[in-house]
Amino acid sequence: MVPNLDLETAIQIISSLETQLSELEGATKEYENDLEQVISKLKSDLLESQQQNKCNKKQITDLEIQVDELENENIQLRNKIETLQLESDRRLERNVLLEHELLDTKEALQKLRVSKEEATSGETRRNTRSLPSQNKKMKLFKDTIKVSTTSSTLYLQNMAKTNNAARSHCNIPNTQITQSTVIATTSSV
């Protein structure tokens, strides 16, 4: 049951309610505007975040491609290093073998020289030749030799620049070494 109100009180209540309604409508519009601004800001942030996400995905894809390329390049470089290391080891081993062959050849040459000196000194005693001609023979005999190699052979060649008669007294036959023994080997880790 509604209490009895006089007209003036009812008008005041209606006026007060209209004022409250007007204030509520203003507040509602203000909240709606604020809410629209928040929604608009969130949409803008979402779009920006999506764009940033796309950029990040593209960067990640690019970085993964670069990582794959670098890994492939790294594998190729490691293979090249292993190949070069093996080649270096083979060359070092070959050099060691050639050095030993050269030392053996020098020893053989020295033995030939000693034998030649002994033969020449014995011949000198028999022929009573003068000492200067003996020294000349020794000088001719000590001329340089040429050392050359192929893939598996070491060659020695007399390089004396003398006439055939003199060369026959100090002849070092062209020597060829085709067999050797492996003394040391190298291996890659």
Curated annotation (Swiss-Prot):
Coiled-coil intervals: 4-121
Domain of life: Eukaryota
Gene Ontology terms describing biological process: cell division; nuclear migration along microtubule
Claim: Coiled coil is one of the keywords in the record: yes
Compartment annotation: Nucleus; Cytoplasm, Cytoskeleton
Segments of skewed composition (Basic and acidic residues): 114-126
Keywords: Cell cycle, Cell division, Coiled coil, Cytoplasm, Cytoskeleton, Microtubule, Mitosis, Nucleus, Transport
Cellular component, GO, one term: nucleus
GO MF term list: microtubule plus-end binding
Region described as Disordered: 114-139
Main location: nucleus
Function statement: Required for nuclear migration to the bud neck during cell division. Targets cytoplasmic dynein to microtubule plus ends thereby promoting dynein-mediated microtubule sliding along the bud cortex and consequently the movement of the mitotic spindle to the bud neck.
Oligomeric form and interacting partners: Self-associates. Interacts with PAC1.
Protein family: Belongs to the nudE family.
Name under which the protein is recorded: Nuclear distribution protein nudE homolog 1
